[in-house]
């Protein structure tokens, strides 16, 4: 990668971010900066804290659909009418096979299930799958299992896994995307997980009609919570979801590539020493501008997502190499 020479204004932002002296007004003002300046600042911070590496992760939709929650963006919600495959929890053999299929590319593998939480029987089976993956691959294991209780979190801590629980958006905007559970339900799980000693991955989705203020408030909450890995998605509206209808009617404007890249940069500047991980929707929103996201992020989800297909893994590896990054 080329060496970055920051102009005086960009250098001031870089130094304030690195020393954690940026306030909320500073972050709001970032939106008005030129994208190239934001990318330069982000890349300088990335080099300072996380070097020229991209951490790769993959997920498996281990239980799909018929979710009782009413998240307007999710094709797995029974409140939406998307046509997707639905199935109960996959066997440990199927989960292990999926993990092994991405082992040569990914550093992390996450078991993801639909629903507000898991049953006791499902949890026992997931623990068995975690053990299988840890014993038979070199992958680090993550799980996304909804709103877990203290005993479940303690059991997962004993298995040395990372927990994923997305806040999705700001506290103020959350009621616009889901009403069957609230923001504080998620906060409680994250706080309990951190208290127990678990690594935590959390983040949100850009493009659901939220404001720039909402995105910044999300970043500040993630910072306050001490989340280890920040998972950021770009909305790929799926036919049959409530949000697809709202975008199609013009009620919500879809996020564009410039807005997405600026948001990723502001996440980096707000959380300079955290892993910023770009996940679903990047192919749909960024298209041929995906490569520029690598200047702001240091984690990338590869392979397929929960109910949509991802970019060819070889294309991702080529993109990373051509941009001069390691994995």
Curated annotation (Swiss-Prot):
Manner of cofactor binding, per the entry note: Binds 1 [4Fe-4S] cluster. The cluster is coordinated with 3 cysteines and an exchangeable S-adenosyl-L-methionine.
Domain Radical SAM core, first and last residues per copy: 49-282
GO molecular function: 2 iron, 2 sulfur cluster binding; 4 iron, 4 sulfur cluster binding; biotin synthase activity; iron ion binding
Binding-site positions, [4Fe-4S] cluster: 67, 71, 74
Residues bound to [2Fe-2S] cluster: 110, 142, 201, 277
Catalytic activity line of the entry: (4R,5S)-dethiobiotin + (sulfur carrier)-SH + 2 reduced [2Fe-2S]-[ferredoxin] + 2 S-adenosyl-L-methionine = (sulfur carrier)-H + biotin + 2 5'-deoxyadenosine + 2 L-methionine + 2 oxidized [2Fe-2S]-[ferredoxin]
Coiled-coil segments on the chain, per record: none
Cofactor names: [4Fe-4S] cluster; [2Fe-2S] cluster
This protein's UniProt keywords: 2Fe-2S, 4Fe-4S, Biotin biosynthesis, Iron, Iron-sulfur, Metal-binding, S-adenosyl-L-methionine, Transferase
Pathway(s) where this gene product acts: Cofactor biosynthesis; biotin biosynthesis; biotin from 7,8-diaminononanoate: step 2/2
EC numbers: 2.8.1.6
PANTHER family referenced in this protein's UniProt entry, alphabetically: BIOTIN SYNTHASE, BIOTIN SYNTHASE, MITOCHONDRIAL
Entry function: Catalyzes the conversion of dethiobiotin (DTB) to biotin by the insertion of a sulfur atom into dethiobiotin via a radical-based mechanism.
This protein's name: Biotin synthase
Gene name of the encoded protein: bioB
